[in-house]
Amino acid sequence: MLLTNAELVDGRTVDLRIDGEQIGAIEPTLDPRDDERVIDADNRLLLPGAIDAHVHFREPGDPHKETWATGSRSAAAGGVTTVIDMPNTTPPTTTGEAFDAKGDAARAACIEYGINGGVSGDWEPDSLFDRPLCALGEVFLADSTGDMGVAPDDFEAAVERAVDEGVTITVHAEDETLFDDNARNADAGGAGRDANADLWSTYRTAAAEAAAVEYATEVGQETGADIHIAHTSTPEGIDAAVDGEATCEVCPHHLYLSRDDLDELGTYGRMNPPLREEDRREAVFERVADGAVDIVATDHAPHTREEKETGLWDAPSGVPGVETMLPLLLNSARQGELSYDRVVDLVAHNPADIFDLDSKGRIEPGYDADLVLVDPDNPQAIHDDDIHSKSGWTPFEGRHGVFPELTLVRGQVIYERTPGDGRGRGEDDEQFSDVDGQNVRA
């Protein structure tokens, strides 16, 4: 395959040849070979496929929320070509047997994937580390979806084992002793969008995040572990990660939503950690823009509308996001809030480096041909009805994103969209290819 007239983030306009599954050549011009498919990029922006280092594709255990087939299609439509799945499925991925079961389910994916191992009081590290783990974690320092919170002794033992195995540890950092029990005991009003979801933000405090990050990074420094802090939601948490020499991620919902949005979202805005004050959101965005934050990842954690349409204290935590991460970031770049170089660092270069995905994340000869073609001049509104996730809704309804027109994984077109008459992405002609994904560690 030959892509012609593609613009890269460094300003070059190039032709790019794909040989098999890898990028073969990048030159100002390349002559087509006989019988070679040629795609004219028409000066649109060519990016490395995004790596979402934090998803919950819910299978095995909860296929009514998401499956590897539906989640990976949603990812492909959003320009994500590799995902890393977290261990809090049913059964939890804390044994070799459970890892194998998830691996069987993951073969339905149309993109690349990594599978993380989990830690619990009864995990089986010997069998787990015998499998091709992408990383260990997220290790939960507080209870969240899946009830996999661990005590300090168990966490420290897991970190030491991960160091011995040379594996990165992803940490869900919240200190439950600093949660606000007064808020937890308050009346949260109605159900769904009528709930007083701001109480969730009051309950799971910013101080709880910062304290847990400080603890996790102290353990990391004492043991020499590679600690990665998941979904930091506050400037204090980010600063603690930087001070503790850990890497960290921020989710799109903490970048683009705040407590100000909870009157409209209700329980649809309940996640762990919760949405924060607008001034904290702005400070988090500044740290993403200036390089303090290593990656953006979604914590894609879908639930059905029926599950969200309950009271605040009963509704599950989590929002879908794998399809909208890259489009939202590209729209910020289009508006001058981020550079395109920074977007590529956040979703491609840095996650590939942190999780040792050696053939991913760059547009260079010899790298996997995981590529995304976008038109920055054609942002489109985000609507529930256009989302391919099985959940069928998004917390970003009405916002704008720059969506892919072409997504390739290992040189194969897995998603192609022909923009229509401007009525919206849901009116465009979309095609998915039936391609089998691969485990990035296999």
Each PLM stretch: what is its role?
Residues 44-108:
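Metal-associated gating/positioning segment near the N- to mid-region
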Residues 123, 127-139, 144-296:
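Histidine/acidic residue-rich metal-binding segments in metalloenzymes
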Residues 198-224, 295-296, 301-376:
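His/Asp/Glu-enriched, well-ordered alpha-helical/loop segment
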Residues 56-64, 84-97, 117-123, 139-151, ...:
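Divalent metal-binding segments
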Residues 368-442:
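C-terminal cap of metal-dependent C-N hydrolases
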